[in-house]
């Protein structure tokens, strides 16, 4: 029997990124970028995918995100969570991507988007992967964001509140609502 807790356990967990890695990257150490990438790619992929709902768009946004991290490491001042800085860069590139796409959407792109839905290739269990892919379709964008920030990035509620600019009650209720929707969805599939 599969439950929401088992599915969430399959999400990639974010590893902490020390400020020193970003400072080292700012000084030209390209090995630091490789380490940042390795520690953040799975959680960041899942988060951006929760926003775009399209693996191709997600890959484009992530490429721009990591280039920006390399180019702007010197502007990072530390003191905050490094992953919050990285997630904010990814969110900004996602928003820019949506603006660009809105201006040039075509029938071909819409067909491509339908074919390229969620891809949870990082989830090893094939049954869990298929359930996650279908379950994500039932959540609203903000519910997906909150779920991923909590379950994948391991953020505390107050960190999610600060990041999204929402109040605590909204974050808590949307998280609970997303869990309930997933539980109901899984009940239908079993």
Model-derived regions: residue spans:
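Intrinsic, short, N-terminal disordered tails of RNA polymerase sigma-factor systems
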Residues: 1-23, 35, 133-141, 162, ...
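Internal acidic/polar
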Residues: 2-5, 14-15, 96, 103-129, ...
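Short, charged helix-capping/linker segments at alpha-helix termini
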Residues: 8-9, 26-35, 45-64, 168, ...
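Sigma70-family region 2
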Residues: 26-27, 53, 64-81, 100-101
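Short helix-capping/turn signature of helix-turn-helix
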Residues: 39-42, 50-53, 148-155
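Structural recognition of an alpha-helix C-terminal capping motif at a helix-to-coil junction
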Residues: 46, 60-67, 80-92
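Arg/Lys-rich amphipathic alpha helix in sigma70-family domain 2
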Residues: 71-78, 88-108
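DNA-recognition helix of helix-turn-helix
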Residues: 95, 143, 152, 157-189
């Amino acid at each position: 029997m599969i439950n929401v807790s088992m599915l969430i356990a399959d999400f990639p967990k974010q590893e902490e990124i020390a400020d020193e890695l970003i400072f080292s990257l700012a000084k030209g150490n390209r090995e630091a970028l490789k380490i940042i990438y390795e520690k953040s790619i799975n959680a960041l992929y899942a988060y951006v995918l929760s926003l775009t709902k399209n693996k191709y768009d997600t890959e484009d946004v992530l490429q721009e995100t990591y280039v920006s991290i390399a180019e702007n490491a010197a502007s990072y001042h530390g003191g905050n969570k490094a992953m919050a800085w990285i997630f904010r860069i990814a969110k900004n590139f996602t928003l820019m991507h949506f603006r660009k796409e809105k201006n040039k959407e075509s029938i071909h792109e819409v067909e491509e988007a339908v074919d390229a839905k969620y891809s949870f290739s990082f989830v090893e269990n094939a049954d869990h992967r298929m359930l996650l892919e279908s379950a994500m379709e039932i959540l609203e964008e903000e519910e997906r964001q909150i779920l991923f920030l909590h379950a994948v990035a391991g953020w505390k509620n107050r960190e999610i509140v600060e990041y999204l600019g929402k109040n605590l009650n909204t974050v808590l209720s949307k998280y609970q609502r997303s869990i309930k929707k997933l539980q109901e969805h899984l009940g239908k599939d079993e």
